[in-house]
UniProtKB/Swiss-Prot annotation:
InterPro entries according to UniProt: Beta-prop_ATRN-MKLN-like, CTLH_C, CTLH_complex_component, Gal_Oxase/kelch_b-propeller, Galactose-bd-like_sf, Kelch-typ_b-propeller, LisH, Muskelin_N
Gene Ontology CC terms, in alphabetical order: cell cortex; cytoplasm; cytosol; GABA-ergic synapse; nucleoplasm; postsynaptic endosome membrane; postsynaptic specialization membrane of symmetric synapse; ruffle
Subunit comment: Homodimer; may form higher oligomers. Identified in the CTLH complex that contains GID4, RANBP9 and/or RANBP10, MKLN1, MAEA, RMND5A (or alternatively its paralog RMND5B), GID8, ARMC8, WDR26 and YPEL5. Within this complex, MAEA, RMND5A (or alternatively its paralog RMND5B), GID8, WDR26, and RANBP9 and/or RANBP10 form the catalytic core, while GID4, MKLN1, ARMC8 and YPEL5 have ancillary roles. Interacts with RANBP9. Part of a complex consisting of RANBP9, MKLN1 and GID8. Interacts with GABRA1. Interacts with the C-terminal tail of PTGER3.
Kelch repeat intervals: 284-330, 339-391, 400-458, 469-515, 526-578, 597-651
GO molecular function, one term: identical protein binding
Disruption phenotype: No visible phenotype. Hippocampus slices from mutant mice show minor differences in the amplitude of miniature inhibitory postsynaptic currents, and somewhat slower decay times.
The UniProt record lists the keyword ATP-binding: no
GO biological process: actin cytoskeleton organization; cell-matrix adhesion; neurotransmitter receptor transport postsynaptic membrane to endosome; regulation of cell shape; regulation of receptor internalization; vesicle-mediated transport in synapse
Protein name (record): Muskelin
Originating species: Mus musculus (Mouse)
Signal peptide annotation: none
Region (Important for location in the cytosol): 701-735
Length: 735
């Protein structure tokens, strides 16, 4: 044990010895025990299943119980059709009762891969004695499964594992007792419930919920139940439930105030390939440059959210010592120092020469309204060459800028080597704003090493100011659309592959090949992605749609909160255009993380009939979840609906008055479904008593059962830490 006051040392993670315990099958000499030895250059050193017909598995038995934190798969030195494209890993203290620890897949390459296994319940580590690996899909369709080498690592120190084992045994027993308590109470077995609770001293739930059960189910005191729900809402107890609900998008077209006599010149015109940033402190959107269909633009605008008005800062920034007209450049804002940086641009091949291909780099100071040229040519200063369709992020805290990817512009005539005709892409650079120095962090690499990253264009890159990581995904490299997703820790210089893009989670991740615009909310740990039109003409018309995705960084999961399809658009094209922006590319999207609002401007609608057409529409997007007020009203509606149904059996006249007054005011009459349900409630007044009650005294049982059902519904809004277990005792009975 550590001495008093000493810092606790994290337990050491080490290799865990195991033996092969059971297997589904094996073929020829490809024995299960081959996975104990790592021989990447020996093609026969592997386990291979006899068929790919499920279930195929290997069960490993650890030398002693351990906290199994990681699993590592070794591979053959070349790609192989039998490698596991999809697999699952289960673990437990006995082979009959296992928990899923991992669902993933291997890349079809020669590099070892390590995965973190689930090893905690409620932040408490739990031990395993058995590990079961279940192959689901091989890289070659209809090929048998092969595993070359498996390594398990974790903690097997008995001083650490034994307390975890004790906790796990106690946890399982406690949950079993809680399931019994829940079952007894649901069926009104009062004596059994009280006896078990008294004997075990185990609480079924938080005392507040026990109080609610007493008032609602036992006493039928509906007013007291409403008061209790109101207190819970005001105390923030429904916040966890709200955070788990899906967002609903709400688009609003912004019609800015116009200044008299200014005509159309008091707001930015139609364009694509422009850039926007937002100052969240002053709620100001800045827009610079772009392409209007015939020429590059050099105008610079500010939109005040509070004033709902655009102001033209400059008609031509070049005349004010600023950047020349440009498109496909990038901007980022330092909100602390109130400065905007811009880098890169696209140049038509006809105007490219050694002078024009210099990569200039500018900074705009918001307070003094002045531009400063930081560099005439960033490549000469150790930074990137002239690029377009790259990405740039600001780290205000450390006063650093990160730029990644983009295609390097080259002169047409120059032929340095055979690679000159192939497109070249820029790597990952860091710019120290204080020292005004560049540093190359990663070169463009097509290798599959753990720290290598592949450059691209049209990708998304975001900086998480709290965990200090860059997140990069999507984009295009020559004709290939990339679907990988990785993070880069700017402080430790480490790349972490979140998804290599090989898994076929079709429909569960944003589609490749479509223009994606992304924003990040460090407070909510969310990445937002608006997916629009493809730049590829062939892909454009087949299924034009917008979709909005959210990536939960903590849960490592994507969810699609909104899609609009071509089919629905054909019928409603006019009204739909007024409700939401049409699909597009070359547009810009910025996010105000303080006020939780997105702003979108312009872009290219990709109309083949009018290729020069650009847009100048301006939209805001709010992602809405149920509010506290909505949930309070909804809970009151559920309680009063049940109260009405009870009244209808006893006193129909009193019930009718209750329906018209008390229940009516809790209904959302703008919701067609809720309105219809409310209207159908009146039919309860005409049901005979026999519709509600059976023989003998079962009318009491019916009321108790109905109230219990309402209680279980209301409990769902409370945090899991307060509620009874989710499962039911009867569900454990298998046929």
């Amino acid at each position: 044990m550590a001495a008093g006051g000493a810092v606790a040392v994290a337990p050491e993670c080490r290799l865990l010895p195991y033996a092969l315990h059971k297997w589904s099958s094996f073929s020829s000499t490809y024995l299960p025990e081959n996975i104990l030895v790592d021989k990447p250059n020996d093609q026969s050193s592997r386990w291979s299943s006899e068929s790919n017909y499920p279930p195929q598995y290997l069960i490993l038995k650890l030398e002693r119980p351990a906290i199994v934190q990681n699993i590592t798969f070794g591979k053959y030195e070349k790609t192989h059709v039998c490698n596991l494209k999809k697999f699952k890993v289960f673990g437990g203290m006995n082979e009959e009762n296992m928990t899923e620890l991992l669902s993933s897949g291997l890349k079809n390459d020669y590099n070892k891969e390590t995965f973190t296994l689930k090893h905690k319940i409620d932040e408490q580590m739990f031990p395993c004695r058995f590990i079961k690996i279940v192959p689901l899909l091989s890289w070659g369709p209809s090929f048998n499964f092969s595993i070359w080498y498996v390594e398990l690592s974790g903690i097997d120190d008995p001083d650490i594992v034994q307390p975890c084992l004790n906790w796990y045994s106690k946890y399982r027993e406690q949950e079993a007792i809680r399931l019994c308590l829940k079952h007894f109470r649901q069926h009104n077995y009062t004596e059994a419930f009280e006896s078990l609770q008294k004997k075990t001293k185990i609480a079924l739930e938080h005392p507040m919920l026990t109080d609610m059960h007493d008032k609602l189910v036992l006493k039928g005191d509906f007013d007291a139940c409403e008061e209790l729900i109101e207190k819970a809402v005001n105390d923030g107890l429904f916040n966890q439930y709200i955070s788990q609900q899906e967002y609903k998008p709400r688009w609003s077209q912004i019609i800015p105030k116009s200044t008299k006599g200014d005509g159309e010149d008091n707001r930015p015109g139609m364009r694509g390939g422009h850039q926007m940033v937002i100052d969240v402190q002053t709620e100001t959107v800045y827009l610079f440059g772009g392409w209007d269909g015939t020429q590059d633009l050099a105008d610079f605008w500010a939109y005040s959210v509070k004033e709902n008005q655009w102001t033209c800062i400059s008609r031509d920034t070049e005349k004010e010592n600023g950047p020349s007209a440009r498109s496909c450049h990038k901007m980022c804002i330092d909100i602390q120092r109130r400065q905007i940086y811009t880098l890169g641009r696209y140049l038509d091949s006809s105007v490219r020469n050694s002078k024009s291909l210099k990569s200039d780099f500018y900074r705009y100071d918001i307070d003094t309204n002045t531009w400063m040229l930081l560099s005439e040519d960033t490549a000469a200063d150790g930074g990137p060459k002239l690029v377009f369709d790259h990405q740039m992020c600001m780290d205000s805290e450390k006063h650093m800028i990160y730029t990644f990817g983009g295609r390097i512009l080259t002169c047409n005539g120059s032929v340095d080597d055979s690679r000159a005709s192939e497109p070249q892409f820029s790597g990952l650079f860091a710019f120290n704003c204080q020292c005004q120095t560049w540093k190359l962090l990663r070169e463009d690499s097509c290798n599959a090493g753990p720290e290598d990253i592949q450059s691209r264009i049209g990708h998304c890159m975001l900086f998480h100011s709290k965990n200090r990581c860059l997140y990069v995904f999507g984009g295009q490299r020559s004709k290939t659309y990339l679907n990988d997703f990785f993070s880069y820790d700017v402080d430790s210089d480490h790349v972490d592959i979140i998804s290599d893009g090989t898994k076929k989670d079709s429909g569960m991740v944003p589609m490749t090949g479509f223009t994606q615009r992304a924003t990040i909310d460090p407070e909510l740990n969310e990445i937002h992605v608006l997916s629009g039109l493809s730049k590829d003409k062939e892909k454009r018309e087949e299924n034009v749609r917008n979709s909005f995705w959210i990536y939960d960084i903590v849960r490592n999961s994507w969810s699609c909160v909104y899609k609009n399809d071509q089919a629905t658009k054909d019928n409603l094209s006019k009204s739909l255009q007024e409700e939401e922006p049409c699909p597009r590319f070359a547009h810009q999207l910025v996010y105000d993380e303080l006020h939780k609002v997105h702003y979108l401007f312009g872009g290219n609608p990709g109309k083949s009939c009018s290729p020069k057409m650009r847009l100048d529409d301006f939209w805001s997007l709010k992602l809405c979840r149920p509010s506290k007020d909505y949930l309070l009203r909804h809970c009151k509606y559920l309680i009063r609906k049940h109260r009405f149904e009870e009244k209808a059996q006893m006193d129909p006249l009193s019930a009718l008055k209750y329906l018209q007054n008390d229940l009516y005011i809790t209904v959302d009459h703008s919701d067609p479904e809720e309105t219809k349900e409310f209207q159908l409630l009146a039919s309860a007044l005409f049901k005979s008593g026999s519709d509600f009650t059976a023989l003998g005294f079962s009318d009491v049982d019916h009321t108790y059962a109905q109230r219990t059902q309402l209680f279980d519904t209301l409990v769902n809004f409370f945090p899991d830490s307060m509620t009874p277990p989710k499962g039911n005792l009867v569900d454990l009975i298998t046929l």
